[in-house]
Curated annotation (Swiss-Prot):
EC numbers on record: 2.7.7.6
Keyword Cytoplasm included in the entry's annotation: no
Domain of life from the UniProt record: Bacteria
One Pfam family linked to the record: RNA_pol_Rpb2_7
GO biological process: DNA-templated transcription
Lineage summary: Bacteria, Pseudomonadati, Pseudomonadota, Alphaproteobacteria, Rickettsiales
Enzyme class, UniProt record, top EC level: transferase
Name of the protein in its database record: DNA-directed RNA polymerase subunit beta
Gene: rpoB
Alphabetical UniProt keywords: DNA-directed RNA polymerase, Nucleotidyltransferase, Transcription, Transferase
Length: 1373
């Protein structure tokens, strides 16, 4: 056996990784979790459960929906359709083919269903199985997720955004005194299910409790309690305690003394011990709870109260006549003076009354007596009348409706989360599998609501992240699936009842279109399925990690208040407090924090390190907001000694409610993993974030997402250390799938022989086809460049090719440029930016943008449209870029108005008959009359044609261009196949050679003699095919050769088969929309150089527009002659408080000066003035321990590393744990610069020094996607609105500029009457005047006449619509 790990080059690719000088002090224990895990886990793992065997699938996602909808039975229970299992076929087209052909990337869902037919005996009613049919049924194509967490729908990449919504469960709150004029708090409760009716409970101003179902008319709460089967006695006994008053002869009543019921007040009568008769306190004296407890402790059990004390109390049971047992008063009735006289007359000795006091109000009792419904039937009918007004209420219908509302699993679902939340809030212990309401739930909700009113407990905070959960992709699509399957269930039942069930197969019953249409509708039109923001890799990642409170079942931006949008203490480590849009969506659309993840219940969790006895361990625990409230959590920057013990007498900790307390080290339960866990990915890319104002940091995070990928990428000198993670997880770069050795590299693809052996011991081959000049969703350019060389050894997950906006595996959204802060002739007034000509000349900020144009040749009723070069009335000059078919060549330079694809459409006075159509088809006649409908380059676009794609309908003959493109693609596929085969052959034949050398030949080709011993030289003279003809003596060797031959043939056959399938797919024609014969797509790439009007920004929210490009010789320059690239206005800093940019500039200044110092050392080393030790010493002083791995390598590699940092030393200053001002000064000193970071600058125009020192340094700037080329627009003549006859507005309509009301005032103020008349007539909507003006211009005259503007006629028509006739009377002057 040959080992694949032989002859591996010593140098792995990981040696090329960039090393940054890291200023962070906190040791990272946890890695950043995969940034798009939230999308992939939710959909693939939890919803589809792809690649999991049927028997091992958990009851969640698709499996649980199918289990809940099936079995489906018909009305008579004769037929029963059961679900067995489901599986997915392989998708017809891969991701790339789907995006090229405008198709959806989806896999067919095959569900195995079992149809059981029963025989029912009409007399006995017994059932017997008559027959069982099992069949695999196609249920439509289900969109699959790409490896980057997106969906391809109709050829475009889309993202399904996760939604934040209120968690199911019960919530208690009050109106904050806003409803009632007195400011009285009205408490209410709401039960929110996952699906089903909402139940609201509320107090009114008179302290009566009501309930509503689905916000309908309110009813008394006791109606609901009676409906769930409680009697008056049960209601009173459940919600109230009872106390007995015993008659004491001639003295009054003795009653139990309960100190808990005593509040501080002055006594109106004496406090007398009923057992001893002692007076403990006189009337008028004050009693307090503490004094009451003291008396109770001293043995006071019963107290004596006056006879009339009972008046106003409520009975806790029926009052009966001791002699006749007749009911004198019912439970809950108030004792009046008359009733007291009856009690005295009948000598009733014991009276039981309700305990009602300030801690236990009479609300339920009052509601009970206000409610007219006295039994369950009346209560149910009352509820029925509210929910179904106008329908006759009978008890069966009412009972069925009430059961279906809250107790039917089909219609009401609290979900597991809802049940957990309900149990915890109401202190119940009901099984998590019970996801409907129970009687206990309702009773206890009322209990908790009344307790809140009595001042016990606290209301819920709706914005607490324990009360808001996240619905990710999987769950959102699961809900759509359920809707689709429920609709399908109805059609299945109809079909079962309609046809002869005995002859039907399962596929006859199922109509998959219903299901497919619901899923399609979700992906195409839902507010949460969004066109992916693909401006750059960061914007992609951020879009996938977005949390939206909007969307179906969420909030609407008009009704969302301030509280929902605000930052909540529980957002810490879960939702970024910085990154959110400016504008009306602020706070409603958020971004997940860097380390956050979503647990199985949909709550966001954040990681913490466990602290045991004051020692910080490396154990990382993820806590949700609910769990976190129970612990004391320290900050990540708490001081820790070498042994991990927390230092200091007290540690600052967060506790529940977002408050901070100081506790001793042994009381701390957890500490943060890293300070970076607070912010999102975009915010974690901002160095010195801690020195920026939050508003500017917000703008900085948002603007990084708008940075355009540039031609030349450049990772920031001053980074935060997260750049590599973002590039890796975004999917922009290419990662190695396995360990391996690079066999071939060119700009289009990388071939790697992997080191993971297959079962037969042969290597597998990974071929990575790189994306070249592809168009992104936002017309930016996706282009991948290889980072590896032939012979490199790569490890799994190494980055082997850079994508857009990445540089050596790190995200690189902009460029490092030399910046000076000083005013320059007013050209950088109000955030304007002044740039040097060098930046334009050297393409520093040049980007490529790709536009796609499409033309469709359709079959019209006058005959087919044709793509051709033969276009009527078009000059040969205009056709110069088209090939013989009429399609533009690749590489052609085009400008606005040029023809891209020639197309003619038949036009005729009358439609042609079928006979004519047939004759034309037979004799090949062209249409008599055609019009030009070619695809032209639209206005404002120019560039180079980089790609052309031609799609032809199946059965339509392909033209030469389509055949040429197809041939090109087949050649590419063949090359991939041949290269893979070559690597396998190389391996197989070198293995064969090892086996054969030294063996004795028995039989073989002509060139060899029998009995000879095989040598390497002998084998070199044979062709590869002749190796198999050799037979040797050793039987074991022959067996092994036979095995190798079998494996080799299988491998070759599999490769050929795969190639044939792909070729067949290419040649088979395309699925085009109805009526389309041919589709041609043309891609034009445009280079956008930086120019005045383009918007630029830094990472700190400092944005501006370019005002002027200045020649290099006029720009300020340094004393060594270096010209400054960009001049910014220093006045943009103080008021905006984003000081991080200044620290970045200073550290950038240190970076390039340290690089110069290293270059000088390398020069001296080459000139033999110094040894390698001095270089090592300087590198250790600069990088610290980070550099040890490099210093252990040979001298050439150390020098090669020094050359890599010759442009600038790369720093990492992690957010909230980065470089302090002193660190920046130390770096400046090490670089031999003034620690102030300021230098003398010379004015390029005068050659004189500026008066003061100027802050100069390297700063990272981005070019944003707001390019002046896409915004600038002008019009002389163009389209007019049909009704008003005024020019249209906006660039997309080629419109004019509106001369509005205020502009008219300006002309009136100047008295410019003629100009005003011209603006309001001929330049606007005076149709005749326009024509006359044109005539006079053509004749060379300068005068014009204005007539009546069309708007005047429109106004007259509007008057007429109001039945007012207005006539214009023209009087001759």
């Amino acid at each position: 056996m040959v080992s694949l790990r032989d002859n591996i080059e010593a140098q792995p690719l990981s040696h090329n990784r960039r090393i940054r000088k890291n200023f962070g002090h906190i040791n990272l224990v946890a890695d950043i979790p995969n940034l798009i895990e939230i999308q992939k886990n939710s959909y693939e793992k939890n919803f589809l459960q792809l690649n999991i065997k049927d028997s091992e699938r958990k009851n969640k996602g698709l499996q649980s929906i199918l289990n809940s909808i099936f079995p489906i039975s018909d009305s008579s229970n004769i037929a029963n359709l059961e679900f067995v299992k489901y599986e997915f076929d392989t998708p017809k087209y891969d991701v790339e083919e789907c995006s090229q052909r405008s198709l959806s990337y989806a896999a067919p869902l095959k569900v195995t269903l079992r149809l059981s037919i029963w025989d029912i005996d009409e007399d006995t009613g017994t059932r017997e199985i008559k027959g069982i049919k099992e069949q695999e049924v196609y249920m439509g194509d289900i969109p699959l997720m790409t490896k980057n967490g997106t969906f391809i729908i109709n050829g475009t990449e889309r993202v399904v955004v996760s939604q934040m919504h209120r968690s199911p469960g019960v919530f208690f709150y009050h109106d904050e005194g806003k409803v009632h004029s007195s400011g009285k708090l009205l408490y209410s409760a709401r039960v929110i299910p996952y699906r089903g009716s909402w139940l609201d409970l509320e107090f009114d101003a008179k302290d009566v409790i009501y309930f509503r179902i689905d916000r309908k008319r309110k009813l008394y709460i006791t109606t609901l309690l009676r409906a769930i089967g409680m009697s008056t006695e049960e209601i009173i006994k459940f919600y109230y305690n009872s106390v007995t008053y015993k008659l004491v002869k001639n003295k009054g009543w003795a009653v139990k003394f309960i100190p808990q019921h005593i509040t501080a007040h002055r006594l109106t009568s004496d406090l007398v011990d009923a057992d001893t008769g002692n007076i403990l306190l006189k009337a008028g004296q004050k009693i307090t709870p503490r004094l009451a407890k003291k008396y109770f402790g001293e043995g006071l059990n019963n107290i004596l109260v006056a006879h009339e004390t009972l008046i106003g109390k409520y009975l806790s049971e029926d009052l009966r006549d001791p002699t006749s047992d007749e009911v004198l008063a019912k439970i809950g009735e108030m004792i009046t003076a008359d009733m007291l006289n009856v009690i005295n007359a009948l000598k009733i000795k014991n009276v039981n009354v309700l305990v009602i006091n300030p801690q236990s109000g009479p609300y339920i009792r009052n509601t009970l007596f206000a409610d007219k419904n006295q039994d369950r039937e009346a209560a149910l009918c009352d509820i029925f009348r509210v929910l179904r007004p106008g329908e006759p209420a009978n008890i069966e219908a009412a009972e069925s409706l009430f059961y279906n509302l809250f107790f039917d699993v089909e219609r009401y679902d609290l979900s597991e989360v809802g049940r957990i939340k309900m149990n915890s809030r109401l202190e119940l212990n009901i099984s998590e599998e019970v996801t409907v309401l129970t009687i206990d739930d309702i009773k206890n909700i009322v209990r908790v609501l009344v307790e809140l009113k009595d001042g016990k407990g606290i209301i819920d905070d709706i914005d607490h992240l324990g009360n808001r959960r996240v619905r990710s992709v999987g769950e959102l699509i699961e809900n759509q699936f359920r809707i689709g399957l429920v609709r399908m269930e109805k059609s299945v039942i109809e079909r079962m009842s309609a046809g002869d069930v005995d002859t039907v197969m399962p596929h006859d019953l199922v109509n998959s279109k219903i299901l497919v249409s619901v899923v399609k509708e979700f992906f195409n039109t839902s507010q949460l399925s969004q066109f992916m923001d693909q401006t750059n890799p960061l914007s992609e990642i951020t879009h996938k990690r977005r949390l939206s409170a909007l969307g179906p079942g969420g909030l609407s931006r008009d009704r969302a208040g301030f509280e929902v949008r605000d930052v909540h203490p529980t957002h810490y480590g879960r939702i970024c407090p910085i990154e959110t849009p400016e504008g009306q969506n602020i706070g409603l659309i958020n971004s997940m924090a860097t380390y956050a993840r979503i647990n199985k219940h949909g709550f966001i969790e954040s990681p913490y390190r466990r602290v045991k006895d004051g020692c910080v361990t490396d154990e990382v625990v993820y806590l949700s907001a609910i769990e976190e409230g129970k612990y004391k959590i320290g900050q990540a920057n708490s001081k820790v000694n070498k042994d991990g013990k927390l230092q200091g007498e007290f540690i600052n900790c967060r506790v529940e409610g977002g408050n901070f307390v100081m506790v001793e080290p042994y009381e701390v339960d957890f500490i943060d993993v890293t300070p970076m866990q607070v912010v999102s990915v975009a915010a974690s890319l901002i160095p010195f974030l801690e020195n920026d104002d939050a508003n500017r940091a917000l703008m900085g995070s948002n603007m990084q997402r708008q940075a355009v990928p540039l031609i030349k990428t450049d990772a920031p000198f001053v980074g935060t250390g997260v750049e590599g993670v973002v590039a890796k997880d975004s999917g922009a770069s290419v990662l190695a799938l396995h360990d391996g050795i690079v066999e071939q590299v060119d700009s289009n693809r990388i071939v790697i022989r992997t080191l993971e052996q297959k079962v037969d011991g042969s290597p597998s081959v990974d071929i990575y086809n790189l994306l070249k000049f592809q168009k992104s969703n936002h017309n930016t350019c996706i282009n991948q460049k290889p980072l590896v060389k032939v012979g490199h050894y790569v490890k799994k997950n190494d980055i082997i090719a850079d994508g857009p906006s990445t540089d050596n595996g790190e995200i690189a959204l902009g460029r490092n440029v030399l910046v000076a802060f000083l005013p320059w002739n007013g050209y950088n007034f109000e955030d304007s930016i002044l740039i040097s000509e060098r930046i334009v000349k050297e393409d520093v900020f040049t980007s490529i943008h790709i536009e796609e144009f499409e033309v469709i040749a359709r079959d019209t009723r006058l005959g087919p449209e044709e793509i051709t070069r033969d276009i009527p009335n078009v000059s040969e000059e205009a056709l110069r870029h088209l090939d013989e078919v009429g399609i533009i060549y690749i590489g052609a330079e085009v400008k606005a108005g040029d023809i891209l694809v020639g197309k003619v459409t038949p036009k005729s006075e009358s439609p042609i008959t079928p006979e004519e159509k047939l004759l034309r088809a037979i004799f090949g006649e062209k249409a008599f009359d055609v019009k030009d409908s070619s695809l032209h380059v639209p206005s404002g676009v120019s560039g180079t044609v980089v790609e052309v794609r031609v799609f032809s309908r199946r059965g339509v003959e392909k033209d030469q261009r389509a055949i040429a493109i197809e041939k090109q693609q087949i050649e590419k596929l063949a090359k991939d196949r041949d290269d893979e085969l070559e690597i396998i052959e190389h391996f197989v034949f070198s293995w064969l050679e090892k086996l054969l050398v030294g063996q004795v030949i028995i039989n073989g080709p002509k060139q060899v003699k029998v009995g000879q011993t095989i040598t390497t030289e002998m084998l070199k003279g044979l062709s590869k095919g002749q190796f198999w003809q050799i037979t040797v003596e050793d039987a074991n060797v022959m067996n092994e050769i036979e095995q190798i031959k079998t494996h080799y043939d299988e491998k070759k056959e599999a490769l050929d088969k795969r190639f044939a399938t792909k070729v067949e797919k290419l040649q088979s024609g395309d699925d085009l929309p109805q009526g389309a014969l041919k589709v041609v797509k043309v891609f034009i790439a445009t280079k956008h150089k930086l120019q005045p009007g383009d918007k630029m920004a830094g990472r700190h929210g400092n944005k501006g527009v370019i005002s002027r490009i200045v020649p290099e010789e006029d720009m300020p320059f340094l004393e060594d002659g270096t010209v400054v690239d960009i001049v910014l206005n220093p006045l943009g800093l103080p008021s905006r408080m984003n000081i991080g940019q200044i620290l970045e500039t200073h550290l950038g200044w240190a970076s390039i000066n340290l690089a110069k110092k290293i270059s000088t050392l390398v020069k001296e080393y080459k000139n033999k003035h110094i040894g390698i030790e001095q270089i090592k010493k300087f590198l250790i002083e600069l990088y610290g321990e980070n550099i040890n791995s490099i210093l252990e390598r040979p001298e050439e590699e150390i020098i090669s590393f020094c050359k890599k940092v010759s442009k600038g030393v790369h720093f990492a200053t992690p957010v909230f744990d980065g470089a302090k001002v002193q660190d920046v000064k130390d770096m400046l000193k090490l670089a031999g610069q003034d620690p102030s970071g300021q230098v003398k600058l010379i004015d390029g125009r005068t050659g004189e020094y500026f008066d003061r020192l100027v802050t100069v340094g390297q700063k990272y700037l981005l070019k944003l996607h707001h390019l002046v080329d896409n915004k600038i627009h002008s019009r002389s003549i163009g389209p007019y609105s049909l009704v008003t006859q005024q020019p249209l507005g906006g660039k997309s309509h080629f419109g004019g500029q509106r001369f509005g009301e205020m502009e008219c005032w300006a002309l009136q103020a100047y008295g410019a009457a003629y100009t005003l008349q011209e603006m309001l007539t001929v330049k606007s909507d005076d149709v005749n005047g326009r024509i006359k003006t044109y005539d006079s211009i053509v004749r060379g005259e300068n005068n014009f006449e204005s007539g009546i503007p069309e708007s005047f006629n429109v106004m007259i028509k509007e008057f007429r619509s109001l039945c007012l006739n207005v006539k214009l009377e023209v009087t001759s002057s």
